[in-house]
Amino acid sequence: MNYNEYQKALAAINKSAKRELDDLQGRMYEVQRMKDDKVISEKEAFERDQKLAEIFDSVKNRYARSAERLKMNFAKQDCDIKVGDIIWAVSKGAAKVLKIETIKLAAFDYPMLKLFGTQLTLYGQPYKKQLQHPKGGIYQKDITSINGEPYTYKTRV
């Protein structure tokens, strides 16, 4: 699963959760309307509201667990880049080849690489991993994860 697939799966979970929770909220409003129109008693309205609130909480928790499980599965994948890999980056038109010595990560945060003793934050241009093509030559691949954490590039504001 790449980062785009992860984002799509997360969006699908969120969409399903929103649809189900909106339906439950609609049912809660319906109970309130019936109570206001004196179709059902206060006691019955309270009991129905209580039941719907419990269902609402359980649905919300179920989708939160699904999203957390998806996040953990994505993070456990083999990563694109490891210590010792060679990457290159284009910075102001000049390509730089960098060897990764250590990688420090905060979970699902923008990673920081220690390169030749200096700190380099991966902001700005997307970094690429140099790969040796089986038929000879070198080609580049966008880095989507570093030590299992998703990596997207972002310009510092």
Model-derived regions: residue spans:
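Short intrinsically disordered terminal tails
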Residues: 1, 76, 80-81, 149, ...
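Short, charge/polar-rich alpha-helical segments
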Residues: 1-25
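Short, flexible coil/linker elements and helix-boundary hinge sites characteristic
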Residues: 14, 18, 38-39, 78-80, ...
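Extended alpha-helical coiled-coil "stalk/arm" regions
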Residues: 16-53
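Mixed-charge, Lys/Arg-rich low-complexity intrinsically disordered regions
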Residues: 48-83
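Intrinsically disordered, low-complexity, charged/polar segments
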Residues: 65-69, 118-157
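Basic/aromatic-rich interaction segments and small domains that mediate binding to polyanionic partners
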Residues: 91-131
